[in-house]
């Protein structure tokens, strides 16, 4: 199911790129469109970034093998960010003025998305974020150059609450739900949505940040043992995930 979701995201992103290509006259002159690939093959999240980067390259190669988009072939170049916002902005600045124009940016990072979303309108650069990024950018009236696809972090957080609501037969009044989250722009994204849902549904929201990379969580799970929430939502990434599972087992 995960593979299908990724494949669908790639297909939609490529279709979106097709609508962002130059006019037919310009296409006739230039039968190539450049696509920057911001990747993180190194750094603490490399286990996530490497297959993602490989998959994007494979998909673009497949598109080209089938004739491109309306006959326009996709050229691409990787720029390593190591999931670092500063490096990501450097990649954006270097690639945005690539000769022939840039199709769109898929930053593969929430922090980088935050940083370049302010720059995108002035640069007339499109920011495509399949399933991640800046949740507020779903409002296209404000974020005209952001294209979130397949939902966002608020969508995911709301799905979690809906699932718990089903288990609790439609009422969360008086319940206590803990959010253990990666202390980064990515990890903080679901908080506004969960706070709204807590106010609406009448449950208490405990917010427990975990400092990156997430290998030290004993104090966090001590709070879980003390507070005894009814549910724990884990918003993790990289090495934080297996560490959380081990600590949860020790806490149970």
Feature map (PLM): residue ranges:
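Signal peptide-proximal N-terminal region
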Residues: 30, 54-76, 169-172, 199-202
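Short glycine-centered, acidic/aromatic-flanked micro-motifs in structured strand/loop junctions
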Residues: 39, 78-81, 179-182
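Extracellular/periplasmic Venus flytrap/periplasmic-binding protein
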Residues: 86-90, 135-136, 144-251
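Bacterial N-terminal signal peptides that target proteins for export
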Residues: 1-13
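C-terminal segment of classical bacterial N-terminal signal peptides
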Residues: 15-27
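Conserved hydrophobic helix-helix packing surfaces used for dimerization/oligomerization
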Residues: 33-35, 177-178
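Acidic/histidine-rich, surface-exposed loop or edge segments in extracytoplasmic proteins
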Residues: 36-44
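Beta-alpha junction/loop-to-helix N-cap segments that form part of ligand/metal-binding clefts
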Residues: 32-34, 47-54, 66-140, 149, ...
């Amino acid at each position: 199911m995960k593979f299908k979701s990724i494949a669908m995201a790639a297909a939609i992103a490529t279709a979106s790129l097709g609508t962002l290509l130059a006019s037919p006259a310009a296409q006739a002159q230039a039968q190539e469109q450049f696509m920057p690939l911001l990747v993180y093959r190194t750094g603490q999240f490399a286990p996530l970034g490497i297959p993602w980067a490989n998959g994007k390259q494979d998909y673009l190669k497949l598109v080209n093998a089938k004739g491109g988009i309306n006959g326009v072939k996709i050229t691409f170049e990787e720029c390593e960010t190591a999931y670092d916002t500063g490096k990501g902005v450097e990649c954006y600045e270097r690639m945005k003025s690539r000769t022939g124009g840039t199709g769109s940016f898929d930053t593969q990072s929430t922090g980088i998305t935050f940083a370049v979303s302010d720059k995108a309108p002035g640069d007339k650069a499109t920011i495509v974020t399949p399933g991640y990024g800046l949740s507020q950018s779903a409002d296209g009236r404000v974020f005209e150059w952001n294209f979130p696809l397949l939902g966002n972090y608020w969508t995911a957080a709301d799905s979690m609450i809906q699932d718990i609501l089903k288990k609790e037969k439609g009422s969360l009044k008086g319940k206590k739900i803990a959010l253990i989250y990666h202390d980064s722009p990515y990890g903080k994204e679901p908080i506004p949505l969960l706070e709204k849902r807590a106010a609406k549904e009448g449950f208490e929201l405990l917010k427990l940040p975990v400092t990156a990379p997430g290998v030290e969580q004993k104090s966090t799970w001590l709070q879980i043992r003390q507070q005894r929430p009814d549910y724990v939502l884990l918003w993790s990434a990289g090495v934080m995930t297996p560490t959380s599972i081990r600590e949860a087992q020790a806490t149970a």
